[in-house]
């Protein structure tokens, strides 16, 4: 047995053998886009992905698909929200994301490929020194975002008129299982909901299958909904 291990040990020393390196951190673009477009962030050299949310009856309620460059920029992003009857399809063109059908300029970018402005809604984004979006503002609202040391989104606080909505997420202490998390939602400091998610992961530490439990505590009795999330991911 010892002799059989020698070739691989030697290969590890010389070339690293044939193993996948796990990237534990999230890029500023991936983390920030996941905040704004409401999907689970992914790690590593993602080439394209599709994230599908299904209800307890197996019906698709939401789907997010994206393609990324080797540098981690979103070349395209498509969102299908059946619950709200919304479809958004964006394609990268220099410093803008254009509508995939009308080619209208929808989102202005800053830096390499980070969010800067949504002109039609009067929304502008601010980034920190590391390139993560930490603020979004318009005439009607102010939003602040939080991240941990690995760039994982820890939640956001939205202020609009006399209302403050805060979402705080607590991920697993296992750095591989960041998408196993709990979250609490507060409206004007009153708890109105909670979320729990647990996942199975691939060898890039990205979620493949997840169960998402959402509890609406703003109604009495509280209403619990259970969803399944399926991820299809291709890598460079």
From Swiss-Prot:
Query: Which chain positions have N-palmitoyl cysteine-type lipid attachment?
Result: 17
Q: Which InterPro entries match?
A: UPF0257 (IPR010646)
Source domain of life: Bacteria
For membrane topology, the record states: Lipid-anchor
Q: Where found in the cell?
A: Cell membrane
S-diacylglycerol cysteine lipid sites:
17
Which residues, if any, are the signal sequence? 1-16
Q: Which UniProt keywords apply?
A: Cell membrane, Lipoprotein, Membrane, Palmitate, Signal
Main localization of the protein described in the UniProt heading: membrane
Q: Can you name a GO cellular component term?
A: plasma membrane
Q: Which residues form a coiled coil?
A: none
Which HAMAP family does this chain map to? UPF0257 (MF_01065)
Which family does the record claim for this protein? Belongs to the UPF0257 family.
Spell out the NCBIfam families in the cross-references: PRK02939.1
For this entry, the protein name equals UPF0257 lipoprotein YnfC
Annotated organism of origin: Escherichia coli O6:H1 (strain CFT073 / ATCC 700928 / UPEC)
Which gene is this protein's source? ynfC
């Amino acid at each position: 047995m010892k002799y059989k291990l020698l070739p691989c040990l030697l290969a590890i020393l010389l070339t690293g053998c044939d193993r996948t390196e796990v990237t534990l951190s999230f890029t500023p673009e991936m983390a920030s886009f996941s905040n704004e477009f409401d999907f689970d962030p992914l790690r590593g050299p993602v080439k394209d992905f599709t994230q599908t949310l299904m209800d307890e009856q197996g019906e698709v309620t939401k789907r997010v698909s994206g393609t990324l460059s080797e540098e981690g920029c979103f070349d395209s992003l498509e969102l299908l929200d059946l619950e709200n009857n919304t479809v958004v399809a964006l394609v990268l063109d220099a410093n803008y994301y254009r509508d995939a059908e009308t080619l209208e300029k929808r989102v202005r970018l800053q830096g390499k490929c980070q969010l800067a402005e949504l002109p039609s809604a009067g929304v502008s984004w601010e980034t920190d020194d590391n390139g993560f979006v930490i603020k979004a503002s318009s005439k009607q609202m102010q939003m602040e975002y939080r991240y941990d040391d690995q760039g994982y989104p820890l939640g956001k606080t939205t202020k609009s008129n006399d209302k403050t909505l805060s979402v705080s997420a607590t991920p697993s202490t296992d750095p591989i299982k960041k998408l196993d998390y709990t979250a609490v939602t507060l409206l004007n400091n009153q708890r109105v909901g909670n979320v729990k998610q647990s996942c199975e992961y691939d060898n890039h530490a990205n979620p493949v299958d997840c169960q998402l439990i959402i509890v609406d505590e703003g109604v009495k009795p509280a209403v619990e909904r259970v969803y399944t999330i399926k991820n299809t991911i291709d890598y460079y």
